[in-house]
Swiss-Prot record:
Family: Belongs to the IRC22 family.
Signal sequence interval, chain numbering: 1-24
Name of the protein this chain belongs to: Increased recombination centers protein 22
Main location: endoplasmic reticulum
TM region positions: 170-190
Organism: Saccharomyces cerevisiae (strain AWRI1631)
Region (Disordered): 203-225
The organism's taxonomic lineage, starting at the top: Eukaryota, Fungi, Dikarya, Ascomycota, Saccharomycotina
Ranges facing Cytoplasmic side: 191-225
Membrane association type: Single-pass type I membrane protein
Residue spans of biased composition, Basic and acidic residues class: 212-225
Known role: Is probably involved in a pathway contributing to genomic integrity.
Stretches of the chain found on the membrane's Lumenal side: 25-169
Length: 225
């Protein structure tokens, strides 16, 4: 009996040790994952970024701003520093993704700006031009600002903007439109010609008018033929 009790006690001890080892291993894994996440996560920064698309202001942020292919969108930024230290804005870039799936289709060419030294609670205003060389469709525009805080470089995402590339209106002097007009006028001219010709062929010929003899009895002899 004591032998079986001893075996059971040893089994419980081994099982407890195994569970403790698993728990410690899991704890180490969780800590390692947290360390990795902290290492790859972008540094947080308390910066408020607002911008307007010049000439395309809209009160409804859910509506699409309309552009034609190869139009240039001018972004007017208004940036406020809520950090407890000065920061410097020195660059802008960004990306364009499809709506609603979010597939990247283009990068916004990076550009150097400023640099703008922003004090605590300070505000800076500047602009950025983005060429929309895209096919027709609906997209998200997602700008990023590049800033430095001490010796740390941070990338600040601005709010996305919905926009749509639409087909341009057809000009009256567009060659394609002119060709359509020529064909249309040719059809109308041909139909009119054959209609008038058929009406002419169906018109009855005039009968030769009979010459009536004029009563000349009342005329003086001098005027009679």
């Amino acid at each position: 009996m004591r032998f079986f009790m001893l075996i059971g006690f040893n089994l419980l001890t081994a099982l407890s040790s195994f569970c403790a080892a698993i728990s410690a291993n899991n704890s180490d894994n969780v800590e390692h994952e947290q360390e990795v996440a902290e290492a790859v996560a972008p540094p947080s920064i308390n910066i408020e970024v607002k911008y307007d698309v010049v000439g395309k202001e809209s009160e409804n942020h859910d509506s699409f701003l309309e552009f034609y292919a190869e139009d240039t969108a001018t972004l007017a930024y208004n940036v406020t520093n809520w950090e407890d230290t000065n920061i410097t804005i020195f660059g802008v870039n960004g990306t364009i993704v499809t709506y609603p799936h979010g597939y990247p289709v283009a990068d916004i060419t990076g550009a150097s700006i400023g640099p703008y030294e922003m004090e605590v609670n300070g505000t800076s205003k500047f602009g950025q031009d983005v060429t929309l060389n895209l096919p027709e469709g609906q997209y998200f525009l997602i700008p990023f600002l590049l800033a430095s805080r001490f010796d740390e470089i941070v990338r600040i995402a601005a709010p996305p903007t919905l926009f749509e590339i639409v087909s341009p209106p057809i000009s009256f002097f567009n060659p394609q439109f002119l060709s359509v007009q020529v064909i249309f006028l040719a059809i109308i001219g041909g139909v009119s010609y054959y209609y008038m010709k058929s009406k002419t062929n169906q018109r009855p010929s005039k009968k030769s008018a009979t010459v009536k003899k004029v009563d000349e009895s009342w005329l003086p002899e001098t005027y009679k033929k």
